[in-house]
Amino acid sequence: GEAPAGAEADTVKGDALDLPFDDGSFDRVIAAEIFEHLPNDTAAMAELCRVLRPGGIAAVTVPSWLPERLCWALSEEYHTVEGGHVRIYTRAELEAKLKATGFHIGPHHHAHALHAPYWWLKCAVGTDNDTHPAVAAYHRMLVWDILKAPRLTRTAERVLNPLIGKSVVVYLRKPLDRAGDGV
């Protein structure tokens, strides 16, 4: 949703391995599509847990295994670019790492199924080839879908998300105490 009227926010530049916030600074945190880029993902996960207050909720997203694996198979360039993806997670691997850093694992779902074919096209024709007719047409469709949210594409995405959702979303809770029994 949108921020309520009068809400304020600050932009802070930081390092995912050493966040510039005190322990327990946030009630809610989101880590969207970052862990797959970091060689030391577990340190970043621990930092996320550190800045979340006990009882706080986190949402983490990473690329889903199947769509990401297809991108890697279609394009060496997709995953060897500097700063690019250094790993592909299964949901079980991601959840095990998050649990090991102190989180309780909650529900999960897949999202952005209509985005997976777009990335497969880009991987097939070149990740920088935004002018390819198929890539450009698919991009226009995605923008239209985002802006208009027509029933047809919303239904298609809801049906396809469990199969080819580009991202997996995992919800987490930080225990009230480090023993983990206070949630």
Report each predicted region and the residues it spans.
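Residue-level signal for beta-strand positions within conserved beta-sheet cores that form or flank
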Residues: 7, 82, 104
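A structural motif corresponding to the C-terminal end of an alpha-helix
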Residues: 97-103
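A C-terminal cap/extension of S-adenosyl-L-methionine-dependent methyltransferases
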Residues: 73, 112-183
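Conserved SAM-binding loop
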Residues: 1-71, 90-95, 170-174
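A short, structure-level motif marking secondary-structure boundaries and short turns
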Residues: 3, 78-81, 154
